């Protein structure tokens, strides 16, 4: 399931993000790669414990916490602290790879916790017209999905996916990436719950909150979530 979540960050928050990134201490992105993915990773990344990273993390988490589509699609149990990367110049691509199944938090208030990477997420921080290339390419059973979104939008996709970032040939692609351990481990079950939730939201707007069918379907949604969720 690939989900486009719009307007996670407001225009004011994006401006604040750009101001913070203007003096960012970019470093070699290979430091967070596994042995295999390090062979194809060629980008830059902000150090996890740097104050700029921590300020950006607060902005991103605030955007996620208020966004109903993000919650509906991801059903987050744990969110790995957001990381920030840059593709451009000679450090401009990341070849095909699969994310590690479990990530270990090494800084911040949740240091020492492990996060199972059920859902991968990329939040775009640069407008698409400011750089060439840089598409996130996600391989799934329907073929290759190419993603290049407006600044402030994000994409959610299964952590099991083979994916890559195409070479950036002009400008710089700046983004945020992180992983989610979901209350519902199965991608198929999350997809069904998200689709049901979106249809319910439509029915609630068009039929009303007190319609018997709407109340019954709401109960079915929550009973399925109760059956499948692990909190």
From Swiss-Prot:
Cofactor field: Fe(2+); L-ascorbate
Where Fe cation is bound, by residue? 97, 99, 163
Q: Which UniProt keywords apply?
A: Dioxygenase, Iron, Metal-binding, Oxidoreductase, Vitamin C
Q: Which EC class is the enzyme in? A: oxidoreductase
Give a GO molecular function annotation for the protein: L-ascorbic acid binding
Query: What's the superkingdom here?
Result: Bacteria
Q: How is the cofactor bound?
A: Binds 1 Fe(2+) ion per subunit.
EC annotation from Swiss-Prot or TrEMBL: 1.14.11.-
Record-linked SMART domains: P4Hc (SM00702)
Q: Which InterPro entries match?
A: Oxoglu/Fe-dep_dioxygenase_dom, PKHD_C, PKHD_hydroxylase, Pro_4_hyd_alph, Pro_4_hyd_alph_FE2OG_OXY
Q: Where, by residue number, does 2-oxoglutarate bind?
A: 173
**Fe2OG dioxygenase domain: residues covered:** 78-182
GO BP terms, alphabetized: DNA damage response; intracellular iron ion homeostasis
PANTHER family the record matches: PKHD-TYPE HYDROXYLASE YBIX
Name of the protein described by the UniProt record: PKHD-type hydroxylase Lcho_1570
**Lineage, opening ranks:** Bacteria, Pseudomonadati, Pseudomonadota, Betaproteobacteria, Burkholderiales
């Amino acid at each position: 399931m690939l989900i486009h979540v719009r307007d996670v960050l407001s225009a004011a928050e994006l401006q604040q993000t750009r101001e913070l990134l203007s003096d960012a201490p970019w470093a070699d992105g290979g430091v967070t790669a596994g042995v295999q993915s390090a062979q194809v990773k060629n980008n830059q990344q902000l150090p996890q414990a740097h104050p700029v990273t921590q300020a950006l993390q607060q902005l991103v988490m605030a955007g996620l916490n208020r966004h109903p589509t993000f919650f509906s699609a991801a059903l987050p149990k744990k969110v790995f602290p957001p990381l920030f990367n840059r593709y451009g110049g000679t450090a401009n691509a990341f070849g095909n790879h699969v994310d590690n199944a479990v990530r270990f938090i090494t800084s911040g208030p949740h240091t020492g916790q492990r996060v199972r990477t059920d859902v991968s997420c990329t939040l775009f921080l640069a407008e698409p017209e400011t750089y060439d290339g840089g598409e996130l390419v996600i391989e799934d059973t329907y073929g290759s999905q190419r993603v290049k979104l407006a600044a402030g939008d994000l994409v959610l996709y299964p952590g099991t996916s083979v994916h890559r970032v195409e070479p950036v040939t002009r400008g710089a692609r700046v983004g945020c990436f992180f992983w989610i351990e979901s209350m519902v481990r199965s991608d198929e079950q999350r997809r069904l719950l998200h689709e049901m939730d979106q249809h319910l939201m439509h029915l609630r707007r068009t039929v009303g909150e007190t319609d018997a069918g709407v109340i019954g379907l709401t109960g079915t949604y929550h009973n399925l979530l109760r059956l499948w969720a692990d909190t």
